Amino acid sequence: VTSTNDAVYAATSLGAFRVSLEDNSITRINKANNLSDVGISCLQGIPERDMLLVGYDNGNLDIMIGNKFINLSDIKESALIAAKKINSIYVKDDFAFLCTEFGIVQLDLVRLEIKDTYLIGENGAYVNVFDLEIADGRILVATDR
């Protein structure tokens, strides 16, 4: 569950529900009417940008800005030989950090493009990253190791 300026969103494996904060109306959002995929793994609202990020089990990412949907399939289509699920999304300033089953992907929220990928295991090995937090200039990462 997450929120933007005008709505609260909840995810299911086949789509999401949007509850309007203005009139409490409920709208179903799915592959048939806006989303690019099924298998939602996480949602992250960014109220100050009127933006919603939708991460998927296969690494796909939808970005909703207002009522416009943009698909960013770079992770899904990458040649990485690893599971690509987006576990969670952390937002800091102009960037979103996608915590994935192989590491961390930094998304530029202004340019709407991948800025960098961090393989944080020993010698660049894949590490399943569940979540992260940035505090006091440090990145704290929750992994399976």
Q: Where would I find each of the regions flagged by the language model?
A:
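Surface-exposed, polar helix/loop patches in the mature regions of secreted/periplasmic/lumenal proteins
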Residues: V54-Y56, N60-I75
